[in-house]
UniProtKB/Swiss-Prot annotation:
Organism encoding this protein: Legionella pneumophila subsp. pneumophila (strain Philadelphia 1 / ATCC 33152 / DSM 7513)
GO cellular component, one term: cytoplasm
Protein name (record): Ribosomal RNA small subunit methyltransferase J
Chain positions recorded as S-adenosyl-L-methionine binding sites: E112, R113, D164
PANTHER family, A to Z: RIBOSOMAL RNA SMALL SUBUNIT METHYLTRANSFERASE J (PTHR36112:SF1)
Amino acid sequence: MNRIKAVGYENNELKEKAQLLADQLNLQLDQNADTCLFVTPEKLTLKIRNFSLMFADFSAMTWSKRRGEGKRQGLIRACKPTKGIKILDATAGWGKDAAILATFGADVVMLERHPVMAALLADALSRRNEADIQKMCLSLIASDAISFLHSLQEKDYPDIIYIDPMHPERNKSALVKKEMQVLQQLIGTDHDAMELIELSLSHVKSRVVVKWPQKVKPLLPPDASIDGKTVRFDIYMAQFSSN
């Protein structure tokens, strides 16, 4: 898949909105592009040839249905999200893991450095109604995680940092979902994952949780791990100590 180079739109009534987005992201405006950010009357989507339109979704109704299965997931067992816990999702992607964590009451801040993915996440947040906002405490910062962590003051360190780096191993599996296939091709491998993990350890109050392919050696020896069928969650205890 080529990099996203254009913003398209469904009808002429949406042209102005699409133009504003194209200007904001420094992309071309092309109504007929077959690979683009695509503006519809309802939402901002990602249009990829041979795929149905893809979009982020943070409606409470969607994610409350997955809360029950979430209790059994390694994600929840590793992060232990509860009301009042502040979690920084340093690699938000489509925001699905962040949404699951938020349904358990955690205050989740998503970081996303890719401008196209950040635009899709921002649009999903803007579509929430009051009930969605009350049930899921989610926010977005369009930023590189390493730069963001360097800018944090000690008093603002999150309780937990969650990292789900892009890994080339995922491209080899036929079972990888279409959203992950697209994300892998759009963003590519996170070559700075080691740097991000090491920095996170000194900028977190409790622990860092890293989602990693089950059969791949961890980047750093973890303090604990929770295994799943295809991935595991490596847990690293904080190296931060307040003066």
